[in-house]
Amino acid sequence: MTTEPKDPVADLAPEPAVPSLVDRYFTRWYKADVKGKPCEDHCILQHSNRICVITLAGSHPVLQSGKTIKSISYQISTNCSRLQNKVSGKFKRGAQFLTELAPLCKIYCSDGEEYTISSCVRGRLMEVNENILHKPSILQEKPSTEGYIAVVLPKFEESKSITEGLLTQKEYEEVVVKRLRATTAAS
């Protein structure tokens, strides 16, 4: 019984990576420094049917180590709560209309920091993730899947133009690298 000699080059070749469910069905778009606040980056997952899922980008301060989320609130003002959004029918009647800068929720951390998460996309609010109200930790554990913030449906006419002010994955990675270089050069 002879054994074939092992090919050392084959051991070094990486296995073809299977794309995640999110990467397979969604295109990632990013909005860096939302409302001029440094590092407060948002990620918009756009499906081919134009639905957009609003999540936190990996560099957002809430997702950094050491942060603990105390609570999350969809109560934007005394008269406006995203939880009151009731959508019905084929034409999504009753959905709240959002602009790019419309606040979706507020995240309160145990260190006293407060972060307002914005829509980044014009459209109708389809749903908010009520699961993060009861278990805020999933926002940090699974930000692109179970820890999403909200689902927004852009107007059909605007569905192609919503990505104009957003960054691609590669452009966003370049922004993060520049940010890291700037902080290491300053220290």
Swiss-Prot record:
Instruction: Please give the subunit comment from the record.
Output: Interacts with F-actin. Interacts with G-actin.
Q: Name one Pfam family in it.
A: GCV_H
Q: What's the source species for this entry?
A: Bos taurus (Bovine)
Which family is it part of? Answer: Belongs to the ABITRAM family.
Q: Gene3D superfamilies attached here?
A: 2.40.50.100
Where would you find this protein in the cell? Nucleus speckle; Cell projection, Lamellipodium; Nucleus; Cell projection, Growth cone
Q: What gene name is given for the protein in this entry?
A: ABITRAM
This protein's name: Protein Abitram
Please describe what this protein does. Actin-binding protein that regulates actin polymerization, filopodia dynamics and increases the branching of proximal dendrites of developing neurons. May play a role in transcription regulation.
What's a GO biological-process term for it? regulation of actin filament polymerization
One Gene Ontology cellular component = growth cone
User: Which keywords annotate this record?
Assistant: Actin-binding, Cell projection, Nucleus
Q: Does the keyword Nucleus apply?
A: yes
Q: What superkingdom does the record give?
A: Eukaryota
Q: Which GO terms describe its molecular function?
A: actin filament binding; actin monomer binding
The keyword Nucleus is assigned to this record: yes
